Design a protein with these regions (language model features):
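Short, glycine- and charge-enriched coil/turn segments that flank and shape catalytic ligand pockets
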Residues: 73-74, 177
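Short, cationic low-complexity segments
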Residues: 84-98, 176-180
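A general marker of short, structured functional hotspots
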Residues: 75, 131, 182-184
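Short linear sequence elements within intrinsically disordered, low-complexity coil regions
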Residues: 31, 84, 140, 191-193
Length: 207
């Protein structure tokens, strides 16, 4: 049994100005609609046949925010059930370093705590829960791992992630005509810049 908590706090590499924050509507998973603040900026976007998303760099720590929104005809639950570890890690790497899209993301805060064993198994991480798992390099005793729980608290706003620090708005960032608006349930993750392994991962279903 492992109990872990994840804390990330940093400002954006390219921040938001006051004119980049506007109220809009978010279509909740439960069928209701919420009025929330949306943050708009030019970011590197990606897409495939089932989803689209973007990456946004953090200023100080070697991580970035990744958001993935399934297409309108695919529910978040269905997308998660079919999501593999390879797809999760590879999809954000398809972004172009020079092509930017206007992206609008809602401000959100999420607090959750519970078992992530099923989530890990769904993306192919199963050996650690079997008798074949070898933890001898880290522990003197023979251990069997039967569950992993994680407590996550994250807030995404115009200043950064779980951060009260002001980030400087980049008025020289390139702009495009097309846009991506995350106005329905999506996946968020804070990932390592090199490996794209998630430090924090979760979903925004209702605001």
């Amino acid at each position: 049994y492992i109990d872990s908590s994840a804390i990330v706090s940093d400002s954006w590499l390219r921040g938001y100005g006051e004119s980049d924050v506007k109220q809009g509507s978010f279509s909740n998973q439960n069928g209701s609609t919420a009025k929330v603040n949306f943050l708009t900026s030019a970011e590197r976007a990606f897409s495939d046949e089932d989803a689209e998303g973007f990456v946004k760099d953090l200023k100080s720590i070697p991580c970035k925010l990744v958001c993935i929104m399934p297409n309108k005809d695919i529910s978040l639950e269905k997308y998660l059930n079919e999501l593999t570890a390879d797809r999760l890690l590879n999809l954000p790497t398809t972004v172009s370093p020079t092509d930017f899209t206007n992206v609008s993301i809602p401000e959100f805060s999420v607090e959750s705590s519970g078992s992530i064993k099923k989530n890990l198994e769904n993306i192919g991480i199963t050996t650690i829960f079997s008798s074949d798992a070898d933890f001898s390099k880290g522990f003197a005793e023979n251990l069997i791992l039967n569950d992993v729980t994680q407590a996550v608290s994250i807030s995404v706003n115009k200043n950064g992630i779980s951060s009260d620090n002001q980030s400087e708005a980049d008025k020289n960032a390139p702009k495009t005509e097309e846009g991506l608006v995350l106005d329905r349930p999506f996946i968020y993750a804070v990932v390592d810049n090199e490996s794209y392994l998630p430090v924090i991962i979760g979903t925004v279903s209702n605001l």
